[in-house]
Curated annotation (Swiss-Prot):
It comes from Caenorhabditis elegans. GO terms for cellular component: meiotic nuclear membrane microtubule tethering complex; nuclear envelope; nuclear outer membrane. Keywords: Coiled coil, Developmental protein, Membrane, Nucleus, Transmembrane, Transmembrane helix. The chain crosses the membrane at residues 1005-1024. GO terms for molecular function: dynein light chain binding. Residues 986-1041 form the KASH domain. GO terms for biological process: egg-laying behavior; locomotion; nervous system development; nuclear migration; nuclear migration along microtubule; post-embryonic development; protein localization to nuclear envelope; regulation of cell migration. This is Nuclear migration protein unc-83.
Length: 1041
């Protein structure tokens, strides 16, 4: 009790301190959240003030963007520490982001809607800001691409990386397109008078667009790389999980049971198994030995002649009593492969002669007593052996041999002890028949010296993974089962004609039996390149793509499994079916593939075939696991080769040139008449397509390059077909057809490669351009009615000018090239005249573009001058309405308006003359009426002058004023003009001094003030004795005289 008290006293402060620390952390995080919310509120108020112009101090958008980014960083930190505050934090961030977007839109609209004099500068600033934004976005995207490229090496989940990269790809596509469209729109709206500055901005935008295209392509290639990695990983997983690629299945060895199985024996066997399982570190659970029926109803498959306890037949009881003193002994085991290769061994076994007699009634009753007979009929022994739990036998039986493990269990068939098995007889007949036609490779495989296979005497249980000791024991008692398998590829050519022989063994139903003793062979074909040429044509079309010619991922994995060597051959004669065959007398063992032209689908296809053939032609089988392979070398004595065959082979192969590629023996067999006919038809169709395209007049230089590549590829394919036909199968294809096709392709290839074709194409292009330029009078048919029409016409003429300039440079380069001097030496004079025609056309188009640009500039000046006159007249009228009678200012404004009217009249005359010279006489009637607009402004200015003169007119005295009769309305304008002239004459007459003094009150008031000042000075002098004004006072007396 004291110990617990002391323990609690010691541990309590630590708990308290930890709780205090936790509370401090929570409080600090809560304070951070409060500070973040306050910052959000402050920033939102600043954004709203800037948005509605509520503050005298303006804050730039860049500063607000920096503050927003700082808040986003702090938000990420807070979310990492306190996830429960996610809703409030994200809500405020979204609100601030929306407000910032509105502020940016308003800022951009203000920049775009500036004063007319600042339009160019504002457009340039907006363009520079947009380009800066585009560059920042490009930097960010490049950084994210580099991060994804680094993640390829370390990212375990490639699917997640692929989804991230696809999202980035969509962002690059959409965001980049929006930004580039914005830049193009700004440049289109900005019409700068400085052409060099405009060209610089267009060059900058083009560079940014190219950079965006490069980033887009890099992102797309990264997506393809990730997809290829995923496909490769999936294919490797499929190949690792394929049971055909691992070693042969471990057969369960026979066991023998002597007498009654006691409890001690059972315990010893279980102890041995536990030790073995512990050594191999294999865990076997109870679910591994689960049967779909009860344990007491189970009947061992290996013991087909032992009765079940539930069977009460008297005949079977009698049989058990007669066999009480007999024992079980081990027999020869079949640990080979379940493909029929050990049928000879079973045929030599005579254990079937010693079977215990059994009647059909006894067998039928025993089967009826078993509740699992249907299960046995449908499940193979290899599948059941993993679930088998041996049952204790309560009696001893006579030593009897067992059948092989590699069989189907079929209890419904009758079996008589006196009956000889026809399967064995057929096998022995096949072995003894000397007249049986066999291939040389088949006879070679029968020269193997077979060993006997001794079964294991120790009871074993099949685990989920065999141990190394088990593999060693099985390897000692096994034979080299690869002899028949190795020669299987050579015999397969004879077996292909009989599909029934391909799918079943010798002991099949065709020998009138219902109990096959061997499992059916798997329907695997030849281990050669036949399936490659069925799915992937070597002579693939030039129009095909990589995705069309290459098989999908699953098919590629299957192809890799079939090409991989599964068993180790005893010698290189057994490895002949692998395809490593020399096609020369020297015996080169390395396969070579002729390289096709670059950047063609044929080259990629040949490269893949080369890799697959190299994997197939390996001499040794790859190790699929760390466990030792249960293979064994045995003695092999091949028969002496026939020299006549080799001599014929050498004579045939020596006819082939040294430049021929070494190919597989089966290629000529699979490249038969059907494949050759298909190659010829496709090549002819390609030839027709290319010839038809060449006949068209609009074929350009890139198309000629493509045609050259197509011709070279087809020519190479026809050459290879001729070489194969002449080397292996002299009679399977007519040589004349291929030679004629080759000559046609060769002529076409030479005609395309010759520089004369390119020169003629350029000549046609130059002639078409000059013909188009000669009809440039069609520009006069354009109906120009507005400034937009002038801009469109100017763009069209500028594009034509650029095209002519580029083609003129191409023509000059062509005339200066050596190929032209060699081919068209006599036509140099004609080409010189064409070059002069280009110079004249460029000069004419340049002058037309210059005149159109001047018209456009004058039209812009016309519009701006109209705006200036309109604004000045509105100002003058507003002053007159407000009563501000500053006559001098108004007169200056009137004079300025008159000068602008004179310049506007000059512009009107120039625009009318220029547009009339550009257009035809028929369209000159539809020109804009500039004189009508000029008369409108002139009349408005005249009315404004009359109004000003009426307001500043001086009235005459009433005594002198003469009242004329009431004027008629038609004479109102003339009377106003006469009154203004009289006033001007009156104002111009000189006045005398007396009349001026008498008429001016200001002069009178000034004179009165001067008199009063003089009187005040006299009064001051008389009172103080000093004159009025400043005086000098001597300190030490007056100076000496």
């Amino acid at each position: 009790m004291d110990v617990m008290d002391s323990f609690s006293e010691v541990e309590m402060p630590n708990d308290i301190s930890s709780e205090d620390h936790l509370l401090k952390v929570i409080e600090s995080s809560a304070e951070e959240v409060d500070i973040f919310l306050e910052n959000c509120s402050s920033l939102y108020n600043l954004i709203l003030d800037s948005l509605h112009n509520l503050t005298s101090k303006t804050i730039s958008c860049e500063c607000l963007d920096e503050m927003t980014s700082t808040l986003e960083k702090s938000a990420k930190k807070i979310l990492a520490e306190r996830p429960e505050a996610e809703n409030s934090v994200l809500l405020r961030l979204n609100t601030i982001c929306c407000a910032m977007d509105q502020l940016r839109v308003q800022h951009n609209s203000r920049m775009m809607s500036g004063a007319d004099s600042d339009t160019a500068s504002s457009a340039r600033s907006s363009t520079s800001s947009s380009t800066g934004e585009m560059r920042l976005w490009l930097h960010e995207v490049e950084r994210r691409l580099e991060i994804n490229e680094k993640r390829i090496r370390v990212e375990p989940n490639l699917q997640l990386l692929l989804s991230d990269q696809q999202a980035l790809q969509l962002e690059i596509q959409h965001e980049g397109q929006l930004l580039v469209n914005r830049l193009n729109k700004q440049i289109k709206d900005d019409h700068d008078s400085d052409s060099s500055e405009e060209e610089k901005r267009k060059t900058c935008v083009d560079a940014i667009r190219k950079r965006w295209h490069t980033i887009y392509l890099n992102s797309l290639s990264l997506v393809c790389r990730i997809e290829e990695l995923i496909n490769h990983q999936q294919a490797s997983e499929d190949s690792e999980s394929d049971p055909d690629l691992v070693g042969p299945p471990i057969k369960r060895a026979r066991i023998r049971t002597v007498g009654h199985l006691t409890a001690s024996d059972t315990e010893e066997s279980e102890a041995d198994e536990e030790d073995r399982h512990s050594q191999t570190e294999t865990v076997v659970t109870e679910d591994d030995n689960v049967l779909p029926f009860a344990e007491n109803e189970y009947e061992s498959i290996m013991d087909g002649r032992v009765t079940v306890d539930s069977c009460t037949s008297s005949s079977e009881d009698q049989m058990v009593e007669q066999s009480t003193n007999k024992k079980w002994e081990s027999v020869l085991q079949d640990v080979g492969y379940s493909s029929g290769e050990n049928s000879i061994h079973e045929a030599l076994n005579t254990c079937a002669d010693h079977l215990v007699p059994e009647t059909s009634d006894m067998r039928r009753k025993r089967i009826e007593c078993s509740p699992v007979k249907a299960f046995y009929r449908t499940v193979q022994l290899e599948d059941m052996s993993d679930l088998e739990v041996t049952k204790a036998i309560n009696h001893d039986v006579e030593e009897e041999p067992n059948l092989s493990d590699s069989m189907y269990v079929n209890h419904d068939s009758t079996f008589l002890a006196t009956q000889n098995l026809p399967e064995y007889d057929e096998v022995m007949a096949l072995m003894d028949d000397d007249d049986l036609p066999m291939d040389m490779s088949m006879t070679e495989s029968f020269n193997t010296k077979w060993r006997e296979i001794h079964g294991q005497k120790k009871p074993l249980r099949r685990a989920s993974r065999p141990s190394r000791e088990q593999m060693n024991l099985i390897a000692k008692s096994s034979c080299d089962a690869s002899s028949e398998d190795s020669s299987e590829g050579e015999n397969q050519t004879n077996l292909e004609d009989d599909p029934e022989m391909m799918s079943v063994s010798f002991n099949s139903a065709q020998f009138d039996t219902s109990s096959p003793l061997k499992r059916q062979r798997s329907a695997r074909g030849l281990k050669n390149a036949s399936f490659l040429y069925d799915s992937l044509e070597m002579d693939g079309s030039f129009c095909s793509t990589r995705s069309e010619m290459l098989p999908p991922c699953k098919t590629r994995s299957l192809a890799r499994r079939k090409l991989r060597v599964r068993r180790m051959p005893r010698s290189m004669s057994d490895g002949e079916q692998l395809g490593v065959v020399s096609s020369k007398p020297e015996g080169m063992m390395t396969p070579m593939i002729r390289v096709s032209p670059p950047s063609t689908p044929v080259r990629r296809l040949l490269r893949k075939l080369d890799e697959q053939i190299r994997n197939r032609d390996s001499d040794t089988a790859p190790e699929h696991s760390d466990a030792a392979q249960a293979y064994e070398w045995d003695e092999y004595n091949p028969p002496q080769k026939d020299d006549s065959i080799s001599d014929r082979h050498i004579q045939t192969m020596t006819d082939i040139s040294d430049q021929l590629m070494n190919i597989d023996d089966d290629f000529a067999e699979h490249f038969g008449t059907s494949s050759a006919i298909r190659l010829i038809e496709e090549s002819k169709s390609h030839l027709r397509v290319v010839l038809k395209a060449l006949e068209e007049s609009d074929s350009n230089i890139p198309q000629l390059s493509n045609f050259e590549l197509i011709a070279r590829s087809n020519l190479r394919q026809v050459d290879e077909a001729l070489k194969i036909q002449s080397g292996n199968q002299p009679s399977f294809l007519e040589t004349s057809t291929l030679q004629d096709l080759r000559s046609e392709w060769a002529n076409l290839y030479e005609s395309i490669r010759s520089p004369f074709a390119r020169i003629m194409h350029q000549v046609k292009k130059f002639a078409a351009t000059l013909q188009e330029v000669s009809s440039m009078a069609s520009l006069g048919d354009v109906d120009i009615r507005s400034k937009e029409d002038v801009a469109k016409t100017l763009d069209a003429v500028t594009a034509i000018e650029r095209r002519l300039s580029s083609e003129r440079q191409e023509l000059r380069d062509l005339l200066a090239s050596s190929s032209f001097r060699d081919v068209a030496k006599d036509l140099s004079c004609e080409f010189e005249s064409v070059s002069e025609g280009y110079d004249d056309a460029v000069d004419k188009i340049g002058k037309m573009a210059h005149s159109l640009s001047q018209v456009k500039g004058e039209w812009d000046a016309w519009n701006s001058r109209q705006n200036d006159i309109r604004n000045a007249m509105v100002r003058i009228e507003s002053h007159l309405k407000e009563g501000q009678m500053d006559n001098k200012m108004i007169a200056d404004e009137m004079e300025l308006c008159q000068e602008r009217m004179n310049s506007l009249e000059t512009m009107c005359n120039y625009l009318t003359a220029s547009l009339g010279s550009i257009q035809n006489e028929s369209n000159s009637k539809n020109l804009p009426d500039f004189k009508a607009e000029l008369s409108i402004y002139s009349n408005a200015l005249a009315r404004l002058k009359d109004r000003f003169n009426d307001m500043i007119r001086v009235p005459t005295p009433p005594t002198v004023q003469f009242h004329p009769p009431e004027p008629l309305p038609s004479l109102a304008r003339s009377m106003t003009t006469q009154t203004a002239e009289m006033e001007s004459e009156t104002e111009n007459e000189p006045l005398t001094i007396a009349e001026a003094i008498s008429s001016s009150r200001l002069i009178k008031f000034t004179f009165a003030l001067s008199l009063l000042a003089a009187l005040a000075a006299i009064f001051y002098y008389h009172v103080f004795g000093k004159p009025f004004g400043p005086h000098v006072t001597y300190v030490n007396g007056p100076p000496p005289v």
